[in-house]
């Protein structure tokens, strides 16, 4: 008969239990170590994603100034703005005491980053199918890659967003684009493309056409060709089942469907009148670039809610450099911005500057603030002036859901200045784009 050694069984059970407990203890403590490491690693990841700029005077543009305020950024977006903001312990903190903190500036009209040879297509005078983003060369404008793409000369003036246009040497040059002035990749840099259709009235296209021995050379012929193009696009829209694609007509359809606006460069009274007539006839959204004589139609522009992008007024005061073909870029009188604003017209300033082989190499990022300061000196209210180079500019470009003011959820494009933004003595000390520090004053 088999005898059972109960004492041995009890001893074995106790031994197995101790071993099991030891194993569980080891697993438990190892888990704690792993959890601790994961927590530390997660906190490390958050550092740099959370930014707090505290102690400075914050100008949110969309609201009142906040003295001794805090601007909180999380994952590249504005998280909070105020005077009693709790700063997370894992945040990168910059003390801006004695500084001004405001949204990054927007230059609403440039040819920056485009080689002059790529600005104007001379094969034909009307080319709506062309996209300037294809000629955009950030490595040439922003410094050789690979690596960060930075427009240092623009960043030094606090400019974080620009509109780039095809050249104004043809009647209809093509589709413009909106880009940031610093990014890690090209795709990250682009905000919108296409963003508008660029058209030029005045004598400049005619001069180029004479040189190329082609038509049109007169304004009446140029406008006639524009109207023919619009009418052809309307007919194309009514026959969308046509199996033959037409890239130029597809591009024009974006205008007729009001998916993008037309930006018409018009300075003389007659050209501004023509621009408004075209917009009325073909029912597209209109932005006038240049607008040197826009106060001639100030009431009508206000009634039609047409925005004006004024050219630079500061260049003659500061630079001894002569701009070729000045007649094509007439100096806007210093009080025009104030008069347009008073009439209820949305106004922004554009540098109309070139990045590679500029016609006016003295025009860099600082000029946008200088133009704004001059407008203040001639009667435009300071808050309206600051808005014209931030939120109003963003509204004109239809990107105010992303940039232009410190509102929760918008891109954290931020500049820190060492004084009054409208003082010529003030310098931009730091620039952040999407919450990332991209420029510091040397």
Which ranges hold each PLM region?
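Histidine-rich, glycine-flanked metal-binding segment
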Residues: 58, 62-102
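Bacterial N-terminal signal peptides
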Residues: 29-43
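Glycine-enriched alpha-helix->loop->beta-strand junction motifs that scaffold or abut catalytic
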Residues: 279-285, 302-309, 344-346
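N-terminal secretory signal peptides that target proteins for export/translocation
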Residues: 1-27
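Metal-associated gating/positioning segment near the N- to mid-region
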Residues: 99-171
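His/Asp/Glu-enriched, well-ordered alpha-helical/loop segment
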Residues: 117-118, 123-131, 136, 261, ...
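Polyanionic/metal-chelating signatures
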Residues: 155-286
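C-terminal cap of metal-dependent C-N hydrolases
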Residues: 56-59, 395, 407-442
